[in-house]
Amino acid sequence: MKINENKKDIKDIVNEILISLNINESINIEIKPMKQKIASFSFKTKTLRLNKYVVENFDEELLHYIILHELIHFKIKSINHGIKFENELRNYFSKNECDEIELKIIQKLI
């Protein structure tokens, strides 16, 4: 799905992140309205679910972070945000960068 003319296709962003995480498995992508979440990942069906509002209204930087976040869960095979998760995320963003991006996400949602 093309976000808009100025943004990359979601599949392209996902594929870039899969490559950077050295994940050699294919995943499904669903974009749908979600009331409580901006994204989720199902280990059972290998499905990345993205909130339609987020896809349509967030810029590429924020989408990249959200997708990376979910795919790190897939890579480490855990829903937790423990040391393994944090270490993997730090390969891409510093703690300060994460805090700044997460603040932007919150501001876009309120």
Curated annotation (Swiss-Prot):
Look up the domain of life of the source: Archaea
UniProt lists the family membership as follows: To M.jannaschii MJ1213 and A.aeolicus AA15.
Please state what the protein is called: Uncharacterized protein MJ0123
**Residue pairs linked by disulfide bridges in the UniProt entry:** none
What lineage is on file? Answer: Archaea, Methanobacteriati, Methanobacteriota, Methanomada group, Methanococci
Recorded source organism is Methanocaldococcus jannaschii (strain ATCC 43067 / DSM 2661 / JAL-1 / JCM 10045 / NBRC 100440) (Methanococcus jannaschii)
Q: Which InterPro entries match?
A: YgjP-like_metallopeptidase (IPR002725)
